[in-house]
Swiss-Prot record:
Protein name: Tetraacyldisaccharide 4'-kinase
InterPro entries named among the record's database cross-references: LpxK, P-loop_NTPase
GO molecular-function terms, A-Z: ATP binding; tetraacyldisaccharide 4'-kinase activity
Keywords, ordered alphabetically: ATP-binding, Kinase, Lipid A biosynthesis, Lipid biosynthesis, Lipid metabolism, Nucleotide-binding, Transferase
Similarity section: Belongs to the LpxK family.
């Protein structure tokens, strides 16, 4: 193992051991907590899965909120995400979630609360809205907040990764022993992992292309996500062959200089239009009009045996309430 990864791993192991032995304390909220997280840095579909889980909960008329750190935002204070806010204020993914749930349930949408201290964010939510189910965004390594159910999303290459800072792993693969369920596409080979929780939920991954986007268009595709190659592959799978591709770092907030770079690429590649992700459209902000025509692609997940999976979570809720 690389010395830097070994040093990082030693720190992670020490911290986990302190939680396991109760030398570091977990704080518990009044409402049950379901964590949605991963082993690697970014790119496993946590936001689409949280949307999917939210849809299932709303179908069962279960009240919930989402607690998120709000990665990349300018403040650390606790805030309820407002639909007319910006990624700089709330973080791109919390804002995306808030808008998604508001569109699904306009009359009384699930709230998304951001805060660096997610226990305090949860307390704030309970004081404001009463105890309810909390979905903890990116929570697997956030062990300071006690949870009742840990869901970990896996990517196809997770089993081949090494620890940070050389690789993408936040902690060793054996950390999966803490999880209650993993979520994976059929590409993920479960037997490649040294340990596995009892529940393995399979999902089907797909993208939704705008109807007005012609498959014959000369498309410039760009994105700022953790695994851009998956986005470009998805486009090709749906019959779109980009004439040019541009990538930016995950959660990137686009500047005027970035737009000029994209415009130059449009000209040199003779592209008819741009295609990007829903998250990138949000991070483009008011600059988006300079790239017209531009189309946004939404990633979606479909959970097989969704009712059975949700029943497992409901058992946890009922256990806490009983």
């Amino acid at each position: 193992m690389n010395p830097l990864s070994a040093l990082f791993g030693a720190g992670v192991a020490t911290r986990n051991a302190m939680f396991d032995r109760s030398l570091l304390k977990q704080q518990r909220l009044r409402g049950p907590v379901v964590s949605v997280g991963n082993l690697c840095v970014g790119g496993t579909g946590k936001t689409p899965f949280t949307q999917l889980l939210g849809d299932l909960l709303m179908q069962r008329e279960i009240d919930f909120d989402v607690l998120s750190r709000g990665y990349g935002r300018e403040s650390t204070e606790i805030k309820i995400v407002e639909l007319d806010g910006s990624p700089n204020e709330f973080g791109d993914e919390p804002l995306l979630l808030a808008k998604y749930f508001a569109a699904k349930k306009p009359e009384n949408p699930p709230r998304v609360i951001v805060g660096a201290d997610r226990y305090e964010a949860g307390r704030f939510a309970e004081q404001k809205f009463g105890p309810r189910l909390h979905l903890l965004d990116d929570g697997f390594q956030h062990r300071g907040l006690a949870r009742d159910f840990d869901i970990v999303l896996l990517a196809p290459d997770d089993a081949d990764q090494v620890l940070l800072p050389v690789g993408r792993l936040r902690e060793p693969l054996t950390a999966l022993k803490r999880a209650h369920a993993v979520v994976a596409t059929d590409e993920v080979k479960i037997e490649a992992f040294p340990v596995m929780p009892p529940l393995v939920w399979r999902v089907e991954r797909d993208i939704a292309l705008p109807e007005q986007l012609s498959r014959n268009a000369r498309v410039l595709a760009f994105c700022a996500i953790a695994r851009p190659h998956r986005f470009f592959t998805d486009l090709r799978r749906h019959g779109l062959e980009p004439v040019a591709e541009l990538t930016f770092r995950d959660h990137h907030r686009y500047s005027a200089a970035d737009i000029e770079k994209i415009v130059r690429e449009i000209s040199s590649s003779r592209a008819d239009c741009c295609v990007t992700t829903i998250k990138d459209m949000m991070n483009l902000g008011e600059l988006v009009h300079r790239l017209a025509p531009i189309y946004a692609v939404r990633l979606s997940l479909k959970l097989r045996d969704a009712d059975a999976a949700l029943d497992e979570i409901i058992k946890i809720i009922e256990r806490r309430q009983g």
